[in-house]
Amino acid sequence: MRSSVRSALALAVSVAFLPVVTVVTHAHFKLLEPASWLLEDDRGDPQKAGPCGGSNTDWGKPSYAVTKAVGGSKLHLKVQETIYHPGHYRVALAVNSPAELPPDPKATTTDSDRGPRSVSAEIQNPVQVPVLADGLFVHSAKADAPFETDVTLPNIACKRCTLQVIQFMEQHAVNNPGMFTYHHCAVVEIAPDSKKPIDAAWPKER
């Protein structure tokens, strides 16, 4: 009997002094449509680095996927959030180089014991070139189903446009790289619609 009591006490003491493990949750998403330009794992990684994904240790492997579309038409967008975090999405388009993509959304932050923490971000309304849509899929609860919508493409000629889809995360600590944003891109070949005027606000393909 005494042996059993001593064993129980020893177990209780050992459990009491086990290290406390803090779980840090990071939001992640997969770009389902159009096809991502990188091969993504089940969580959508690598996706932290801007403007188009990768990380400090893994810049990703190309998928060589190219989505064909008609200028002035709608392109279907579908993303799956694999790890929940509140926030919203933005879509932008670069004609000649990913360098044409806009900076990540400017964040409002608050101080925490672990450094800056995101509160919100600027949302363009109305959007300006090269942003196609902003403030998409605003959510503050976990969603099991994919987020889907259509975005209207400019009527331009573009053999290898870069379509960028990013997620801004609220209530999130700073990531390195990427700060408060996760990034995915797709290569889109756009053929202009001859029945519509060319969108002069967009850069010409070089």
Predicted stretch roles:
Residues R2-L11:
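Bacterial N-terminal signal peptides that target proteins for export
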Residues A10-V20:
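Bacterial N-terminal signal peptides
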Residues V20-A27:
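Sec/Tat signal peptide C-region and signal peptidase I cleavage site
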Residues H28-R206:
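Structured recognition/catalytic domains enriched at protein termini
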